[in-house]
Amino acid sequence: MNERRVALITLSSGYVGPPLARLLAASGHDLVMHLPNDASTMVQGSDPTPLVDELAALGAAVEVVGDVDLRTSEGNQAVVDVALARFGRLDAACFVTGSIITGKFLGSTLAQWEKLKSVNLDMVFHALQAALPPMIAAGRGQIVVFTSATGARPEPMVSLYGATRAGANALVRAVGLEHAKFGVTVNAIGTNYMDFPGFRQATGADDPERRAVIESQVPMRRLGSMEELAEFTAVLLDGRSRFQTGQFFSYSGGWST
């Protein structure tokens, strides 16, 4: 049995994945890193080889999983099974989900609704069903699901997106309460106004003038960094915070308050 803690991070080559993996590796975690197998989400990354080498230099054993579809039960079970087969345990799981479609509600299509639901809501359902059983059996574990602060603050032009995110937030909170008695924590972090390629491309924030307008909408008057988001997430994942569960945390610079 592996004595180091083991953490799983999905869609790990982009978004919060690299800085979070570094923090967990440095704090004594081995890692299972899932990489996207298509362009169905807004979280895209790059060649993971340098990151894997960097994590190994920090003392982490790393298992990379690629060819799975996390919109399915089978895909989520596969990444959990890899963790158990390689390391014999799963202590922490961070599930990154996200696809966005904007537009007027009456101009929306059923196909758009089904796409958003499959990534933003169904993926969360499948992830929780796969990760919970081994943690319950071990009597310990931490799960964090990334959603969106938009699920807590409805806005026009993103009704489908906001609805699927709100559903994911509610699911995570209820599942966290239901499984607290087993020593497993389940929490959601909903982000907005984060400085990463997906957000900048969607909002035009790569343009300095447009970015200034966007930042003026945030109470903190700036975009959040992936490094500070990773620090916040690590506290919920690394075993230090075992009395916090069933919560939705908005990480948006005060925007959703």
Q: Which role does the model predict for each range below?
A:
Residues 43-47, 181, 193-218:
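A glycine/serine/threonine-rich, flexible loop-to-helix segment
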Residues 104-105, 112-117, 210, 214:
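Substrate-binding pocket helix/loop in short-chain dehydrogenase/reductase
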